[in-house]
Amino acid sequence: MSYKYILLIAGLLLSGFTRTYAAVGDEDWRERATHLIYSPRYFGPNALPIPTLHSASVSNRWEVEFRGEYHHYTGDKTKNWYGRLYIPLVNNRVAVEVTCTYETEYTLTPETRDERFAAGLKNFDQILGDVTIGTHYQILRSEKWLDIVGRMYIRTATGQRLAEARFTDAAGYWFDLTFGKTIAKNKSGTASLRLHGMAGFYCWMTNSMVHRQDDAYTYGIGVTGKYRNLSIQTDYAGYTGYENNGDRPRVLRTNLSYELKKNILSFKYSHGMRDNLYDSYSLGYIRCF
């Protein structure tokens, strides 16, 4: 038998072995994916975020925000970029907000990987997160009573790395009402204290054949103090899911910001509780127009 035929047979055998090996690998991945738990406790820190607390006042200026974030707990350390675009459509009445995350690095412990049924311990390239698109509508603006804003968000399925339990690769949405009232301010308007709250509904798709989606109610309460160009906001927020499978995260957040000529620098710290396992730090820049 000539070398030509020997090489041909060897190539065919190698090709068949490669296809068989890949098929087995695919079956293993699919089997692991069926065990993923679609809740914030068993996914990365950006997969199913807790909605932010709004001041209940629709702004009439554009905002472009870039933020570097670091999330950590004993089983997962994650770094990502966060971007936000805020567009007023009707002066002080209607606005649109678009956000996205871009994870640059994460590292899991073997215990966390196994708990999440994730495919790996660290990323091999950057990971595009989910894009969220929201609308804000000023329902009521009253100094005597309350300011009320209605919000509706949809989360697209653009997030990557389902196998690594980073993003769910499934759509979701939430809507809520945010309430706000300024309870104290000086005559010059350079100092103020404002209370605000949130209540709404949160829903995301799952991989369960019994419950195709998880439903939750959202809530939050907070206070914002301002003095000249400096402001600090503290709030407590979370949501409570129907499944009770790690879908009841809580967070205590603090945001310190300073504005100068439509440029805002801000530092955020978030302390996760219950099914939110992470402490998070971020530094951001906002340009207003």
Placement of each model-derived feature along the sequence:
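Short, well-ordered, mixed-charge alpha-helical segments that flank or form enzyme active sites
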Residues: 156-162, 204-206
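Exposed, low-structure sequence patches enriched in small/polar residues
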Residues: 3-5, 82, 201
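Outer-membrane beta-barrel and related beta-rich outer-membrane complex signature
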Residues: 110, 162-164, 209
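Outer membrane beta-barrel transmembrane domains
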Residues: 109, 117-120, 210-213, 217-289
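Transmembrane beta-barrel outer-membrane domains
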Residues: 74-78, 124-130, 166-172, 188-190, ...
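Transmembrane beta-barrel domains of Gram-negative outer membranes and organellar outer membranes
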Residues: 22-156, 171-178, 184-186, 230-235, ...
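Detector for outer-membrane/organellar transmembrane beta-barrel domains
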Residues: 168-241
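Bacterial Sec-dependent N-terminal signal peptides
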Residues: 1-26
